[in-house]
Amino acid sequence: LTLMPDKYNYLKIENVFQGSVYGEDSLFSLEVSIATKQPAVLSDFFIKALREMEADLVGEITVLILDPTRKQLESVAGRKEITDKILVGLNEYLEREGMRPNIDFAYIINVNIV
C-alpha cells in the first residue's frame, strides 16, 4: 500500500472585502486566499467543496475582519492576527456545518487603505 503524498491546494476567495479602518476616516480593501495540505484526492475534493460554499465563506470572513486597525493592516504581526482569526473562524464554521476543519493556511493577498 502506497501512501499518497500531501498536496497543497489553494482557493482564492473571489471577493474584495471592504470596510472602515477602526478609529479613522479611512477605508480598506483586502483579498483572501485559503489553503489546505492533505492527500491529493482529499485536497481536491475539499477545495471543490469550499468553492461550492464560497458565498458562505465570504459571509464568515466579512464578520471576522470587521473594523481592523491601521496597524493590523500594515504590519506583518497585524496581518497575522487577521489571518489567524480567519483561519480559526472558517474552521469553526466548517465544524458547525459538519465538515472537517481542514483549512491549514489563510493569506491576505492584497491590502489597500484609502
Where are each of the predicted segments found?
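Flexible, low-complexity charged segments
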Residues: 1-114
